[in-house]
C-alpha cells in the first residue's frame, strides 16, 4: 500500500457505506478519490471478485493509491466516467460515490491557489494540466 498522506478526512463515511450497500462481488466507482478514505473503506468490504475503480483528475491523489488487485486508480475527470468504464471493459456498476468539493489538502497547499490564507497565484485548478486557471477566468 502506498504511504497515505494527510489529505482529506472523509465526511459521512459510515453513511456512505450504508448507502452503497456493498456486495462482496460488486463493482464500484469512487469518482472523487482524493485521499482515498472512502475507497479504502469500500475495498475492506469487497470479496476476491469485487472491483473498485477510483478516479481523480488531481494527480496529487495518486500518492494515496491503494495497493490491492481489486483497486484501479484512474487519472481523469468523472465527466468521462462512461468512457473509462468502457476502456476497462466494465458493463455496469453496483454503486458510484461522489464526495464533491474541495479538500483540506487544496486549502493547505499555497501553490494550489484555493485559500485566502496565503499570498499566491489564483490557480484553483483541480487538474494542474488544465489550460486556464482561475486568474485567467476572472481577468
Question: Where would I find each of the regions flagged by the language model?
Answer:
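S-adenosyl-L-methionine-dependent methyltransferase catalytic core, i.e., the SAM/SAH-binding region
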Residues: 1-139
Amino acid at each position: 500500500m502506498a504511504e497515505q498522506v494527510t489529505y482529506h478526512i472523509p465526511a459521512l463515511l459510515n453513511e456512505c457505506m450504508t448507502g452503497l450497500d456493498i456486495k462482496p462481488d460488486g463493482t464500484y466507482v469512487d469518482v472523487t478519490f482524493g485521499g482515498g478514505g472512502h475507497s479504502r473503506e469500500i475495498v475492506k468490504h469487497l470479496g476476491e471478485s469485487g472491483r473498485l475503480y477510483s478516479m481523480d483528475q488531481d494527480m496529487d491523489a495518486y500518492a494515496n493509491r491503494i495497493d490491492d488487485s481489486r483497486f484501479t486508480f484512474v487519472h481523469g475527470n468523472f465527466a468521462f466516467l462512461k468512457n473509462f468504464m468502457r476502456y476497462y471493459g466494465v458493463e455496469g456498476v453496483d454503486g458510484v460515490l461522489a464526495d464533491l468539493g474541495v479538500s483540506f489538502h487544496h486549502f493547505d497547499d499555497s501553490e494550489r491557489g484555493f485559500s485566502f490564507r496565503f499570498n499566491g497565484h489564483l490557480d484553483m485548478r483541480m487538474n494542474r494540466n488544465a489550460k486556464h486557471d482561475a486568474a485567467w477566468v476572472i481577468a
